[in-house]
Amino acid sequence: MRLKAIGLGAVALASMAPSLCSPLWAQSASPAKLAIENPVSEEALRQHINILASDEFEGRGPGTAGETKTIGYIAQQWANAGLKGGLADGGWYDPVNLIESHAAGGSLRFINKGKAVKLPEDSIIIRSRDAAVHLKKLPVVYAGFGVDANGKVVADVAGKLALIRMDDPAFGDVKDLRSRRDAVAKAGAAAVFYIVGGEKAPWDIYKRVYGETTTIPSRQSAAAVDGIIRRDAAQALFAANKVDWDKMIAETVKPEFTGIAFTSKADLDATTHIRTIKSHNVVGKIPGKLGADKGVIMFLGHWDHLGICRPEGAADRICNGAVDNASGIAVLIEAAKRLAKNQPDRDIYFLATTAEEMGLLGAYAFADKPVVPLDKIVAAFNIDTIAVVPKGEKVAILGRGTTTLDADIDAITRSLGREPETGLDSNVMVNRQDGWALKARGVPALMVSGSFADMKKLMAYLEGDYHQPEDQPGDKIILSGAAEDADLHVAIGKHFGSVTAWPGT
């Protein structure tokens, strides 16, 4: 995955022409700064943000009236810019069915030698894939992290309730928690429970976050039942089975660990309220001269936010999401206007995703059923939370060092009179944004922005107005840097849209 950046190679440093397939760079005695034709203005971005993040749009929650207004606005703006609907039938709206689950009740009893194991009160959270599940006399196994350093399931879990640690293992290139859970479930476990404790998140947060989830079919748990058991309850279960907790936790990291079977059996009941939320991605397209055989490029950003996020009686109930991510959608609209003026060599797709705030779900849904084969996407650029810093900031590549695109992006950055931020600090957020859903499938996907060049400034936003009602339209939103980044994305689109500037090899 860590590919070295390559040089510009065939990038022609010739005179700039209006056609997108013409070489990008202008000949000059001082070629460091490229003249920007029709630069994006702060006011243009502000107008879109003021609409998308207005109270009328109710925080842009998926499946709400706010969604209907939001996706209609985006599609209309792209159509006005000259884009075509990006679906195979020419449509704009790609359905995404979100599965909302609410743990409505349940019980988990461990029986050891005919006696119930006494557990602390309110120490277990249970959820099921189906509305109701009843399982009796399940064998119980502690399976450590679930898998070993090679990703192989360590214990015999078939037909059993498997307990695995939630914390990340310190060995090997082990997959994430979801992957570990699903590996155990696919090995035949009837139920999978995480052991939690000692983490920063208090129990009430676990109950809220884990007990109420939204996903898509491909991201559902492979386990019929899964849940969380608090560490003090797990310790009581270990003790009832005469297993030394500290010793067994230490054994977990050893290569030879193969789990331990308990003498206890488990009786489990779970009730889950399930409903489907009908949502949509929006897909637009600038048709290229050469078609998909020469590859396509993509710009994406999420349109959704948190909707009505405060209870009745609160002074402000709406999380408007002005910076996150009305600002990104505003940039997508303005970039589309400029890129559509001249036909590129390659198709350029614009994707506005739903349910990013629920776990990148719209992006994952697109990756599951893409409108263009993923291996045809030669470059994808996600735009998110782009109105954080003023103009003049360095340009960070979130995902630097993971694709062959870096050198060209750095050259484009310098051509606009800006400096690349070559550090890797921003890469800590690679898997927290929509581009990750594509990157995980092999697509060269990046974020390019000044907003991620100074992590202190970004954290000031994340620790302040982020996901709060205060993230709303107003003069305090910094748009000078966003306008600069919008111009940068136009230049990126022209460059990678050209098979002369970017052959794609």
Q: Where would I find each of the regions flagged by the language model?
A:
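C-terminal segment of classical bacterial N-terminal signal peptides
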Residues: 14-24
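Soluble metallo-hydrolase cores and metallopeptidase-like ectodomains found primarily
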Residues: 30-33, 113, 119-152, 219-321, ...
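Second-shell loop/turn segments in exported
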Residues: 31-39, 55-65, 127, 131, ...
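Catalytic-core environment of secreted peptidases
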Residues: 38-57, 62-85, 161-166, 171-175, ...
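Noncatalytic luminal/extracellular "stalk/propeptide" segments of secretory-pathway proteins
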Residues: 58-161, 168, 279
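Metal-dependent peptidase/peptidase-like ectodomains
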Residues: 118, 222-246, 343, 353-457
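Extracellular/luminal Protease-associated
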Residues: 119-225, 287, 317-320, 423-424
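His/Asp/Glu-rich mid-to-C-terminal helical/loop segments that flank catalytic regions of hydrolases
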Residues: 337, 341, 346, 457-505
